A protein has these predicted regions:
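Short, surface-exposed beta-strand-loop junctions and turns on beta-sheet-rich folds
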Residues: 13-15, 22-24, 182-184
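Short, surface-exposed beta-edge/turn micro-motifs
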Residues: 2-4, 35-38, 144-147, 156-157
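N-terminal basic/disordered segments at the start of proteins
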Residues: 1-13
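Non-catalytic accessory segments adjacent to catalytic cores
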Residues: 19-124, 129, 188, 194, ...
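Cytosolic ligand/metal-binding cores
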Residues: 19, 36, 165-217
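SIR2/sirtuin-family catalytic core signature
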Residues: 127-170
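Short, structured patches in soluble enzyme cores that scaffold and shape functional sites
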Residues: 42-44, 119-121, 150-154, 161-163, ...
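Hydrophobic residues embedded in beta-strands of well-ordered beta-sheets
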Residues: 13-15, 50, 156-158, 173-175
Length: 217
């Protein structure tokens, strides 16, 4: 299967689909993205075992499709593979308790000022589960989130559902939202509290994005 990247912007009724026949370009570092255009797939930490990939193929197609599935949804896979993960024996509640205890210990000892606890859960898939259904269900369930589905042989298939609008605006100005969904959405005119500013200042974040446009207000 060829590499693809499909995304739905917050509160939109359409999705953007990109496919290419070539393998993704391997990028050595975030700095090497300077001047490049394309869709970036990057790990949290880049090293020899965690490469950055750029979808910038010459033999590529880009389409815009309605989310109602009325046309063109062959771009989104509607099949299952045979791969399955082993179900964990530890209950989600017990796993969370163990992880929280370890985190809390380091906070009490002032090893770190702030930690973000990320968890994973493995669920059995049924016969109705497919990348297409998962993407469309995510778009329906989270209308104000950025939803994306992408695949390359090098990275596997990933679904993204992000509540944050990292940057939004035009020539008149820009705005951003609290990271990690720490503020409830209450309209466009939101202001960060002193606590939110302090917490986000302690997060080491590097962002490299090739933007073809910014949404107009």
């Amino acid at each position: 299967m060829n590499p693809f990247f499909i995304f739905r912007e917050p509160s939109k009724e359409i999705c953007h689909c990109y496919t290419q026949s070539e393998k993704p370009t391997v990028i050595a570092s975030l700095a090497a993205l300077d001047g490049r255009k394309g869709l970036v797939i990057a790990p949290f930490f880049n090293d020899d075992n965690n490469a950055i990939y750029l979808l910038d193929g010459q033999d590529s197609t880009s389409t815009t499709l309605p989310l109602d599935g009325s046309k063109g949804f062959d771009t989104i896979p509607d099949w299952q593979d045979d791969f399955s993960f082993s179900i964990e024996t530890t209950s989600p509640r017990e796993g969370y308790h163990n992880a929280f205890t370890r985190f809390h210990k380091h906070l009490e000892h002032n090893t770190f000022q702030k930690l973000v606890l990320a968890r994973s859960i493995i669920e059995q898939k049924d016969e109705k589960t497919s990348p297409r259904n998962i993407f469309l269900n995510a778009c329906k369930k989270y209308p104000r989130s950025y939803i994306a589905l992408f695949f390359t042989e090098e990275t596997g298939m990933w679904l993204i559902a992000s509540p944050e609008i990292l940057l939004n605006g035009n020539a008149d100005g820009y705005q951003t939202m609290a990271l990690a969904g720490t503020m409830k959405y209450e309209g466009e005119d939101m202001r960060w509290s002193a606590k939110i500013k302090r917490n986000n200042n302690s997060l080491p974040i590097t962002s490299a994005t090739a933007c073809s446009h910014l949404p107009q207000r």
